[in-house]
Swiss-Prot record:
Topology within the bilayer: Multi-pass membrane protein
UniProt name for this protein: ATPase 10, plasma membrane-type
Location relative to the cell: Membrane
Taxonomic lineage of the native organism: Eukaryota, Viridiplantae, Streptophyta, Embryophyta, Tracheophyta
Molecular function as annotated in GO: ATP binding; ATP hydrolysis activity; ATPase-coupled monoatomic cation transmembrane transporter activity; metal ion binding; P-type ion transporter activity; P-type proton-exporting transporter activity
Transmembrane portions of the chain: 70-89, 102-122, 252-272, 282-299, 651-672, 678-700, 717-737, 759-779, 792-812, 821-841
Amino acid sequence: MAEDLDKPLLDPDTFNRKGIDLGILPLEEVFEYLRTSPQGLLSGDAEERLKIFGPNRLEEKQENRFVKFLGFMWNPLSWVMEAAALMAIALANSQSLGPDWEDFTGIVCLLLINATISFFEENNAGNAAAALMARLALKTRVLRDGQWQEQDASILVPGDIISIKLGDIIPADARLLEGDPLKIDQSVLTGESLPVTKKKGEQVFSGSTCKQGEIEAVVIATGSTTFFGKTARLVDSTDVTGHFQQVLTSIGNFCICSIAVGMVLEIIIMFPVQHRSYRIGINNLLVLLIGGIPIAMPTVLSVTLAIGSHRLSQQGAITKRMTAIEEMAGMDVLCCDKTGTLTLNSLTVDKNLIEVFVDYMDKDTILLLAGRASRLENQDAIDAAIVSMLADPREARANIREIHFLPFNPVDKRTAITYIDSDGKWYRATKGAPEQVLNLCQQKNEIAQRVYAIIDRFAEKGLRSLAVAYQEIPEKSNNSPGGPWRFCGLLPLFDPPRHDSGETILRALSLGVCVKMITGDQLAIAKETGRRLGMGTNMYPSSSLLGHNNDEHEAIPVDELIEMADGFAGVFPEHKYEIVKILQEMKHVVGMTGDGVNDAPALKKADIGIAVADATDAARSSADIVLTDPGLSVIISAVLTSRAIFQRMRNYTVYAVSITIRIVLGFTLLALIWEYDFPPFMVLIIAILNDGTIMTISKDRVRPSPTPESWKLNQIFATGIVIGTYLALVTVLFYWIIVSTTFFEKHFHVKSIANNSEQVSSAMYLQVSIISQALIFVTRSRGWSFFERPGTLLIFAFILAQLAATLIAVYANISFAKITGIGWRWAGVIWLYSLIFYIPLDVIKFVFHYALSGEAWNLVLDRKTAFTYKKDYGKDDGSPNVTISQRSRSAEELRGSRSRASWIAEQTRRRAEIARLLEVHSVSRHLESVIKLKQIDQRMIRAAHTV
């Protein structure tokens, strides 16, 4: 076959030139044109075809790296700095002084430094993201060398034979072969929400999703030659402005408006009133522009998100949408599946509890029938549990010939096999949901009451039920409906809770995240699982969501019922969507876990869609975050890390707003009251050193909030105004003491510099530099900044920057910047002054936060730190233990100081504690009864365990 590969028909463009449409030709001709067979390709042939057709992925537009670099200097904040640069060489060119090339060069350097850091960090983040997304690459089962293999979909070529099953995203355009009809969701291509039925010979398109069925297909087009690829080339990508970008824009606009107000005041007073010279006035305006613009903000925040995304991936949570980190930090409700998330999804069958419904069968026969109705390959948890109960897994197909296998689908909720036994008789066996199997059976009315009674008895013990039935097929045809179905038995399935689920749920509740169990199992099973996990038993059937329940809770509004419930049972995918929708309407930030194709709508609707480990391709494509490790603890760890990331971003925004207000107000007052002119070049030095230091905040050591986070812009602006005003007044006071008093000369024996404007500028430079950079230690902490150790990198950067600033102030003699060194004694005085006025910043922070939220003093006293590393679970010190004092607060206190969501979480946590106490009490009573029955001396036991 390899020697035929050079024939022109395999050229991707040949089919178009010759008018050959592989989508409508008979299958025999398709195989002939593609020179393949139902046995698939050989690896060598596939490799040669891959060279001809290229990888099975859409062509990515290569962006010019230089244009991309320039793009980092094209945003509103950069525009202001670029305007300042133009002012330095154009407007400042007067009075025979010439353009201000020094300031122009400094501004350009500042822009280039920020653009360079942004460029390289985004490249690194992009490479890291590409590596992470490679782990989520679409997989497919392909028939190569006569064997089925799981491979990346990118290696598919025309002529490959692939397997398509429930939940798969179709990896390439293909024609269906022998097998059951498929239900295909083509909404991504056509916009049509209803799935369409596809049978043998029909074409399926890349990007659509298999909703039901299982079948083989031959690939006829890959990559950009697929229907999806051709469509994508006609559509220009559009950038959607997300919430995070809106936040950045709002903060940037606030800073720009603050600077504009200061500039207008200076222009109005300096020129008409004070009659200042033109060049000096321009220099004062440059000080506000250069010092007030948080030019590093886009870089700092994007780098923080990128580093946080990498940290999450190390914890088993891959972020597909970067801003999902911000939303996860604010999540206050988590709707999670029971199976696989709260439990191990490692099912076991208790053979002793199997119920047999036909006289001529025993428990082993029931197990054998269930095994025959199970897959031996690509097993789900139920198939694996059933087959493992057989003495030898091969027994499931021993002495029979399989004719047809019906895989599980969410509609029928059962699997079935048609087979011929050793006597040549035809049978069909099925296993699945008891309700579905019972509806098939002829004796339904006679046995229904007994079946439901057994199901309820199993459910009270936390056991799921699996029904088994069979029928004879006298017509000996796979298409025959067969004879009457016989209900054979019920198998109990036990899915044990994860060992850490109970503790993790309590931790989530204490963090203000309500965990709601969403399960398709019975209500009794859900309540029993909730009791075992200690998450409460306030659960309802799915019918209550539609107002169909007639119990004592029917008077409760649906939205309130959903908000207060611990979980829901018997849930279908449409119920999940409705739960998310109602919670969002009640202003909750909702996370939803899912693994199946039918979970996709709810995952898309949720603020944070979370695809659990081993989720289907459809669920992964709809989710914002994909878990690589099972269990709830991964999600809670991701919540803590997201809050830490959010805290870093919030800390920086408060810092940036404070510095803007401080520069604008402080230097405007100095220019208008004392007619003091600070050199613009020195503001540039401050900005460069500040930006270099503040970049390290992306790796700072922070304390995640004990409650869900959100962008409270009004609070950020108000905090920035208060702190910035204080710092501005401190700087103004410092200037006044230097030029109008002899305080420093008398008490510290330094020489007077009041009449030396260049030395005054050096002193002002050092004071502004110290207090500006030290402010980050205040904004980064929720308690006393002296007692919360920053990250090592931040400390190191601060020391280096301030060492440079101090050396400049002490020794510099820069004529064009008009500064002269002030010596070490003055530097020591300035450091002492800055330290004295640094201390009240914490007090101002507490008082202001207390005025806004009433929580500040609790934060002062409560210094427990929540960890962000999964490896730290279970440690006593430095672990994510939530503050004990928060657990003991009353509901009234919570109503007054937190959101309603946190209050609900507290109520849920209390119900969970009650459920746990009941569990402990029941175990205790059981132990006492055993001790009495065995006539064991309890005093000996107590003595042996007494310290």
